[in-house]
Regions:
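Flexible loop/turn segments at secondary-structure boundaries
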Residues: 213-215, 260-265, 325, 331-335, ...
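Conserved alpha/beta catalytic core and glycan-binding cleft of carbohydrate-active enzymes
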Residues: 136, 320-322, 340-529, 560-608, ...
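Short glycine-biased active-site loop of nucleotidyltransferases that positions the nucleotide triphosphate
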Residues: 91, 215-220, 264-274, 390-392, ...
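Alpha-helical packing segments of well-folded alpha/beta enzyme cores
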Residues: 193-196, 238, 242, 304, ...
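Substrate-binding/active-site clefts of carbohydrate-active enzymes
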Residues: 135, 152-164, 169, 173-354, ...
């Protein structure tokens, strides 16, 4: 095996920071050694097996909690009328640990319980930090822990899929995945949505909002119980059945995991758990997120790192999760959370503004995940562009497999919002879509859930606006909708075809789902109208949504069958005057004419020799185009010219209709 080069060797601009990079690496290596048992980090991370409620070998119950500021802790619940009693008092074990052992008959499947924690000067009800099941009372809205011990444990039937070097990700939210105005379930998703994902050809499911969160409208980002699967979507067995069904179809399941902060709630969450504000969090202002109103973890504490690392291990062990998208990584990495600042140079990544404790934790998390399952993968959501974040740890990086290419979606919005079609720059589009570090892998997307949220707009809605409500019928004649349909397909195709190493689509955007996402809240009368997916729009032949879906399926199929992400895109033509962008990738040529009015006959450009066949065009009638191109058209480039080169000037000539993209494959 060839020696792995350090990131400052592959990027000379990082050489001034060699000492910092090496120091980080050594520090993290030392932490790994301290947390490991032998050479195994996995063997050393087991807090979830010690704390919380578990069975003992003699079939009793044991419950443990870490609360160093507590003076007394009681188990309260249906079994003792929710009253503190000595029979249910935990005994101190030292080092802040507390324990109680109960006979089998005291607790059973479905029993509701909480903790009552007393501390100097006060006390309150709390949910266990390592609780794995919580339920909400429909009347009081209060959450309780629930004993979960079904008579028959779930039996896994299917093996996890293999490695995903180039994931094609379908981002989804279980609760808003149904058509009815209510919270949808795991079982409904497995039955109704998973087959759609498989039919489209996506090979990875990225699921949001799995960790329990008190406020549904937070989109799952205000987590209270990190080990608890959100019960509003169903039972643990129903989620396992969903994961199992995805694996049966060869689809990996990635979890959107929130380790960047915790909800400020005290009754449900970790805030002031034992009366101290800094149990798992930073003390003072640093422990409170100024923009999110939540608590910020102190990643320098061993207890915090053990808690979060155990959380990763738990989800992989218990639910066979194949990987994680780490949310809010920028907020974790910087003391100011990256708020209202521009990242303009490498100094931003290697100076006092970085929370090195967070870097340590993220590197350890990646090591743990990789040791548990070498085929698992991780994705970082980071807007700062920190160098090395998605580089291997051995190379001096943090170890993520991929980073989200977040600037691409922002740029599409900017171009649509601020420029006329005639002002679009082919050079700018090419640069923004392909600009990435050579040593790091990226996931590209034209839009994700962020662009669909209330207050923002999806691409299709920006392109069509109010005419989406009146002119999406096939018989309607609307230049605005025609433009929107054409650009929606072109934008997605060019984004996928230039993607660094993977591609993401948010649920429903493949067919141009109308309107925005707005979860039930006081401001909208607690309505679910905009917190659902109207799948039926993509079914009738008389609506144009169906044809956008058909194109997305064909596009994903092309990317997989041609293996385009195995190669690096190569620019062939960047024609600013005519608004034409042409590039090659793997065995394909992608030619896009963004010109709003002009079509070009016999547009010539240099291309590799061989026979080229048209395999996909956005203008096809089956994709609601105008049918101006002939499917399966063949073009031939001679093998060599007089000078022996395998390219000719103006050697391939195409008809490029306005607002159209075509994919050619070399036979």
């Amino acid at each position: 095996m060839s020696e792995i080069k350090k990131i400052y060797e592959t990027d000379p601009w990082l050489m001034p920071y060699k000492e910092v990079i090496d120091s980080r690496h050594e520090r993290i290596e030392a932490l790994k050694a301290r947390y490991s048992v032998g050479d195994s980090l996995v063997k050393g991370i087991n807090n979830h097996l010690y704390y919380g409620l578990h069975r003992t070998p003699d079939h009793k119950w044991v419950f443990r909690e870490w609360a160093p500021n507590a003076t007394r802790i009681y188990l309260i619940g249906e079994f003792n009328n929710w009253k503190r009693s000595e029979a249910y008092a935990l005994r101190p074990l030292g080092c802040g640990n507390w324990e109680i052992v109960l006979d089998d008959l005291f607790l059973s499947h479905g029993t509701l319980y909480k903790l009552f924690i007393e501390w100097p000067g006060g006390g309150a009800e709390r949910l266990p930090a390592y609780v794995t099941r919580t339920v909400q009372d429909p009347e009081t809205k209060a959450f309780c822990a629930e004993v979960w011990e079904p008579e028959k444990p779930y039996r896994w039937r299917h093996r996890r899929p293999g490695k995903r070097p180039h994931p094609l990700i379908y981002e989804c939210h279980i609760g808003m995945s149904g058509e009815e105005e209510r919270v949808s379930t795991f079982a409904e998703f497995r039955k109704n949505v998973l087959p759609k994902v498989a039919d489209l050809g996506y090979d990875t499911l990225q699921i949001m909002a799995l960790q329990e969160h008190p406020y549904y409208g937070s989109f799952g980002y205000q987590v209270s119980n990190f080990f608890a699967l959100s019960s509003r979507f169903g039972t643990p067995e129903e989620f396992k059945a969903l994961v199992d069904a995805a694996h049966a179809r060869g689809i990996a399941v990635v979890m959107d995991i929130v380790h960047s902060h915790s909800v400020d709630n005290e009754a449900e969450g970790l805030s002031l758990f034992d009366g101290r504000e800094d149990l798992y969090f930073y003390k003072g202002p640093q422990g409170r997120h100024p923009a999110w109103g939540s608590r910020c973890f102190d990643y320098g504490k061993d207890e915090t790192k053990y808690f979060l690392l155990s959380n990763c291990k738990y989800w992989m062990e218990e639910y066979h999760i194949d990987g994680f998208r780490f949310d809010g990584v920028t907020s974790m990495l910087y003391w100011d959370h990256g708020l209202e600042r521009a990242f303009t140079g490498y100094d931003d990544y290697f100076n006092g503004s970085v929370d090195e404790n967070a870097v340590d934790y993220l590197a350890l998390a990646n090591m743990l995940i990789r040791e548990m399952n070498p085929d698992a993968f991780t994705i970082a959501e980071d807007v700062s562009g920190m160098a090395g974040l998605a580089a291997p740890f051995a190379a001096g990086g943090v170890g993520f497999d991929f980073r989200m290419a977040m600037g691409i979606a922002d740029n599409w919005i900017k171009w649509i919002k601020t420029l006329s079609d005639e002002q679009w720059s082919m050079g700018e589009i090419w640069w923004q879509l392909t600009n990435k570090r050579a040593d790091e892998k990226t996931i590209s997307y034209a839009e994700c859930h962020d662009q669909a949220m209330v207050g923002d707009k999806t691409i299709i809605f920006r392109l069509m606006d109010a005419q989406m409500y009146t002119s999406m019928n096939k018989d309607s004649k609307s230049p605005v909708v025609d433009r929107g349909i054409a650009l929606h397909k072109m934008i997605r195709l060019v984004t996928l075809a230039t993607a660094g190493d993977g591609y993401l689509n948010f649920m429903g955007n493949e067919f141009g789902h109308p309107e925005w996402i707005d979860f039930p809240r006081e401001g909208n009368g607690w309505s679910y109208k905009y917190a659902r997916r109207q799948w039926s729009l993509a079914e009738p032949d008389y609506l144009r949504y169906k044809y956008l879906r058909n194109f997305d399926k064909a596009m994903i199929g092309m990317a997989k069958s041609e293996g385009i992400l195995d190669d690096t895109p190569e620019l062939l033509v960047q024609d600013e005057e005519k608004k034409i962008l042409i590039f090659r990738r793997k065995n394909c040529i992608f030619a896009a004419n963004f010109n709003p009015t002009e079509s070009f006959v016999d547009y010539g450009f240099a291309a590799p020799a061989g026979k080229w066949v048209d395999i996909l065009t956005t203008d096809s009638l089956e994709f609601d185009g105008f049918g101006r191109l002939t499917n399966d058209a063949h073009f031939t480039v001679p093998q060599k010219n007089a000078n022996g080169n395998d390219r000719y000037e103006d050697s391939l000539f195409l008809y490029l209709p306005s607002r159209c993209a075509v994919v050619l494959r070399r036979e």
